[in-house]
């Protein structure tokens, strides 16, 4: 009888728990959609500023090549990439294209890049569905003979003496899922796009160095504090030993 009552109340409360939890999840979804709508509004307001910024960037030779290679996660790209990226005249991002946060990234190269590849405009469009990434558009690159940087990557990976892993940023232009490589799209949309000048000037590297230095400095301080505590404990032990010796001498007298 008691077991039956226990089971009844268990399922009764479990049923209402599930209902409440679903209501919470629905509110979370609604909140995410409203946040996305606000983000879209401000993205729209930023467009004229991004266009002005792009006009300035196009007057700086090699801006995007230097910006991309100075990002810590992209510092290991093969040198052949830099030769091609030096002709990258425009990088464009269309972000938050729907409520799931889909985005499109476009690389536009100058005419001199024809000696390496065609076409000169590379596009990758990524969508999300239930947190699953799906590539719905990706330009297929046609490399000129002997100019494919991915071939250089293959050579480096086969070199057992090469301790530094190398990869090509152009490997990202694929519909396949990349393993053990940075997600170029996420790096651009989340970090580089919003303030490329800081990467171009190498300021982000200094920030990381400062953070590492602060952590090491804090660790050293902790070690010094521990050493000081140990010294204080030793001094107290010495004082106690001295008092014990003095008491023993008095007793002997």
Swiss-Prot record:
Sorted alphabetically, which keywords does the UniProt record give? Malaria, Signal
Gene3D superfamilies referenced in this protein's UniProt entry, alphabetically = Nucleosome assembly protein, p53-like tetramerisation domain
Q: Which family does it belong to?
A: Belongs to the nucleosome assembly protein (NAP) family.
Give start-end of the signal peptide: 1-22
Any one of the GO BP annotations: nucleosome assembly
The record, for InterPro entries, names:
NAP-like_sf, NAP_family, p53_tetramer_sf
Q: List the disulfide bonds.
A: none
Return the protein name. Answer: Aspartic acid-rich protein
- UniProt region (Disordered), positions on chain: 211-253
User: Sorted alphabetically, which SUPFAM superfamilies does this protein's record hold?
Assistant: NAP-like (SSF143113)
Q: Which PANTHER family match?
A: TESTIS-SPECIFIC Y-ENCODED PROTEIN
- Tell me what else is known: This protein is coded on the reverse strand of a histidine-rich protein.
Name any GO cellular component annotation.
Answer: nucleus
Species of the source: Plasmodium falciparum (isolate fcm17 / Senegal)
Q: What is the lineage of its organism?
A: Eukaryota, Sar, Alveolata, Apicomplexa, Aconoidasida
